[in-house]
Amino acid sequence: ANLRAIHSELKTAREKAPQGVLGFNIMVATKEYASYVKEAVKAGADIIISGAGLPVSLPELVEGAKTKIAPIVSTAKSAMVICKMWDRKYKRIPDLLVIEGPLAGGHLGFSREDLSRYGADTKDVPHTYHQDLYDEEIRGIMKVVKQFEEKYQKHIPVAIAGGIYTREDVEHAMELGADAVQV
């Protein structure tokens, strides 16, 4: 049923936004990850964004298709692991990199200790969050991106997700080097 839904949902989205870039956010942690990715490609998805684990096999699953791929990372270490692995094994880099910070919802790549260190584990996050600490992590991720951009002579767009509520939040993300935000 889920595989059939991929086709019908994409068709509905194309009818509503024929010029839009349409894709799926597919969690690595799902039991049928490879099947979902392959079906999304078959359905004509423009992009697959993938997290809830490192999407190490994503390039292989979309090989030969026009579908773009975007891993979700939360640390410079995870960005380096995925970029190095894709470079070594598939001779490619992400078409887009999504950075999900500790304020993003969903399946985050943070331990409870990390969330506590960033002040993102309280009932009063707007007053306890240490943005400057996570900004340093984002800068580290951007250095990884730059390294692979230089190697491939190709820009890797970066979208920052989590904690984006206001115009000032968007401007701050852009100051950190993001090309886009995900809300």
Q: What do the PLM-derived regions correspond to, one by one?
A:
Residues 98, 159-160, 182:
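Structured core elements
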Residues 1-148, 152:
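Active-site entrance/lid segments in N-terminal catalytic domains of soluble metabolic enzymes
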Residues 157-165:
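Glycine-rich beta-strand-to-loop/alpha-helix junction loops that act as flexible
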Residues 171-183:
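A compact, surface-exposed functional segment
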Residues 67, 156, 178:
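Short glycine/serine/threonine/alanine-rich loop segments
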Residues 53-54, 165-166, 182:
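Short, glycine/acidic-rich beta->alpha junctions
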Residues 106-107, 167-169:
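Short acidic/glycine-rich loop or secondary-structure boundary segments that cap or lie
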Residues 104, 165, 175:
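Core active-site phosphate/anionic-ligand binding loop and the adjoining beta-turn-alpha structural block
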